[in-house]
């Protein structure tokens, strides 16, 4: 731990069961793991949410575009969001799988899920059932729209939450329609962090009162405070906010400006008249009555942006940033999510990125913890689990299950390490369409078991 004591992480000794997929729920689990919790990710071989089970060569999301022999263990999004977790498989549609989960829940502190409303109840594992198993459990259900209300049964993804919260209508440039949205959906990340805060608060309450908690999180509602000023503006004026692109309602200049090189940019935000004066001095811009006040700068943004762009276009993006920051003007280069960020000297010096070796995916650089606790910072302790990798560790060492019982569960496909045919999301249709259907026997014969780690 770079000389730090992992035992001092604040959630050391807390066990959390994760039933989650895609981004929001798994992000919550990875953050809890970063804080020291023992996170056990519960999956199944009947329905695998790790990308496609049988992707073709060149499929996105795999290192080098190569899915490999066990693609379910190589999917980048899953591996990035599943660090510091143990992985087990349980068929929760079977009574045996539910019984095993109940035993685990009885020895755990937290159960959290971002499954759609009603899924946990369909397993017989709704909150009331979990509360009967262990009254002081902290339980988090975080579907897209919460656990009450007319939308509670609606299915959701990041894009739909982005849309229903009003965020989609605010993003982008005024001259582009709403179909021009990006594929970066902030609600997922916000939902994950919100769940972590809720879990930590509930654990604190439990330590004081001995009581567990049921936490109902609507990912949409967790995200809506990010547009608080927009809602306030509407309540005061009755008018809808317009899409502004990179511009700001009270700051100018405020935007993204071209620099030397192909597709190189710098962002600049001028908040005050003092910063405006500093910008004039840095750029050598002549005094102009059109820009003398914040109001006049906003009234002449097109002309002002052209002057700023004329200055930035002669400079490297990092040089422009240094010149502006030296005068206290908020500025930053636009970096790509690749070599630019990996090689960024600031992130390198802080040790943000960490090299992690995964038995099936190989060695890759992952983002590190998003917070640092003095003296107890926790880097990645283990890579993402292979499918069912810790079945025996969890069932034998935590639950005390004998080998004969675990073998029976394997024979009945309650647990396993290889997906059943058609087990990915939409997998039956995908396999049939691509003509690469494999039987369970063939898949097991051709796919060696992933190595177990202690």
Provide a role label for each language-model segment.
Residues 69-70, 78, 241-249, 256, ...:
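Short Gly/Pro-enriched turn/cap motifs at secondary-structure boundaries
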Residues 147, 176-185, 207-223, 243-247, ...:
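Conserved Rossmann-fold dehydrogenase catalytic segment
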Residues 46, 145-146, 219-224, 261, ...:
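Glycine-rich beta-alpha junction loops
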Residues 179-190, 214, 244-245, 252-254, ...:
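A short glycine-threonine-serine/GTX helix/turn-capping micro-motif
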Residues 253-331:
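Aromatic-enriched alpha-helical interface/lid elements that frame and gate functional surfaces
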Residues 1-208, 386, 392-454:
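N-terminal helix-loop segment corresponding to the beta1-alpha1 unit
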Residues 325-381, 429-433:
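A glycine-rich dinucleotide-binding beta-alpha-beta segment and adjacent secondary-structure elements
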Residues 192-213, 225, 229-237, 280-286:
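Oxidoreductase and adenylate-handling cofactor-binding alpha/beta cores
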